[in-house]
Structure formats: C-alpha cells, structure tokens
C-alpha cells in the first residue's frame, strides 16, 4: 500500500501558496496595464465564482459523508512526508492554473487578473476546507487520511499517532 496522505498536511500549506500566486499575478496584470479598478473587479469575480462553485458543490457535501464512514487504520501505517504531500497538493490544479495564468499574463493581462482571482479563490476554498477539517478532526480526536488519487478511500486514526519516523535525537 502506498503511503497515506495526511489531509491536514495536504490542505493547510497550499493555502498561502495559492493566495500568494494569485496576488503575484494580480500585480503582474497591474504592471502590464490593467487598471486598478478593472483588475480588482476581475480578480474578485474570479475568486468569488470559484469559491461559490466549490463551496456549494455536491462533491464537497459527499466528501463529508465519506469522511464519517472512513475506515479506521493502525497508527503505524506509513504516511507520506510533508515535502511529498505539499508537492502533491500542487498537482494538477495549482500547477495548471499557474501555467494558464502565466500564459494569459503574456497575451491578455485582463484575463490573467481573472485567473489570478481563481487561484486566490482556490486558496480561500482550501482555507475553508482546512478549518472544517481541523474542527472535524478535533471533535472526533482523529486524523483523516487518504491514498493519493481522485476518488480515494478515506481512513481515520487516533490523533497523536506517529505520522513518520522521528528525527534522530541530537547529542548534547
């Protein structure tokens, strides 16, 4: 079995990355001539529409139904490292949107401002999910895990279980 993905590790660190990329591209659109008002409206529209679509989606509601039915798993089950999990959380959505926004920035800065808003919206939705996840886990004293993939099995284990090998102790 592949190492499990700790969904807390998957959802929290990507938030500032997405928000940061969104604002960097917004700045790029501004630098390439999109007016302050126009870029703000396009950015806000992209963020709002993405957040609205994701926060009201059926898939989101079904995730929490699946989470309640997650399979208990042993605390010793291997969990992917922070670095691998963060890298995996950027693929494909963040990387694809970053590439599309960079291409748009070169050819249509106004479109880049809209896409930058979508990137920021991804960060906002990620933050909402991360907060919901933390509250859900805390209420149940568990950690929610999955295997990589689109529609994956969800697992729970008691909070405080070892997630990866401890670093070697330093000699004093």
Q: Whereabouts are the PLM-identified features?
A:
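N-terminal signal-anchor transmembrane alpha-helix
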Residues: 1-40, 50
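Cytosolic juxtamembrane N-terminal segments of multi-pass membrane proteins
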Residues: 1-13, 66-79
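Select subsegments of transmembrane alpha-helices in polytopic membrane proteins
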Residues: 11-22, 82-96
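Alpha-helical transmembrane segments and their membrane-interface junctions
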Residues: 26-33, 37, 90-122
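Hydrophobic alpha-helical membrane-embedded segments
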Residues: 29-62, 127
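Alpha-helical membrane-embedded segments
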Residues: 49-50, 112-136
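Membrane-water interface of transmembrane alpha-helices
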Residues: 51-71, 134-138
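Cytosolic juxtamembrane regulatory segments of multi-pass membrane proteins
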Residues: 77-89, 143-172
């Amino acid at each position: 079995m592949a190492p499990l993905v700790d969904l807390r590790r998957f959802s929290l660190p990507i938030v500032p990355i997405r928000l940061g990329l969104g604002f960097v591209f917004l700045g790029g659109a501004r630098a390439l001539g999109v007016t302050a008002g126009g870029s703000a409206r396009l950015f806000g529209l992209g963020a709002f529409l993405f957040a609205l679509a994701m926060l009201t989606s059926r898939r989101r509601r079904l995730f929490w139904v699946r989470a309640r039915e997650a399979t208990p798993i042993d605390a010793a089950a291997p969990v992917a490292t922070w670095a691998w999990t963060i890298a995996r959380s950027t693929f494909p959505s963040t990387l694809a949107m970053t590439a599309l926004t960079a291409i748009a920035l070169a050819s249509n800065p106004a479109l880049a401002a809209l896409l930058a808003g979508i990137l920021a919206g991804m960060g906002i939705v990620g933050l909402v999910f991360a907060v919901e996840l933390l509250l859900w886990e805390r209420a149940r004293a568990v950690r929610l895990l999955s295997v990589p993939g689109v529609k994956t099995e969800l697992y729970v284990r008691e909070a405080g279980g070892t997630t990866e090998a401890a670093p070697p102790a330093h000699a004093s």
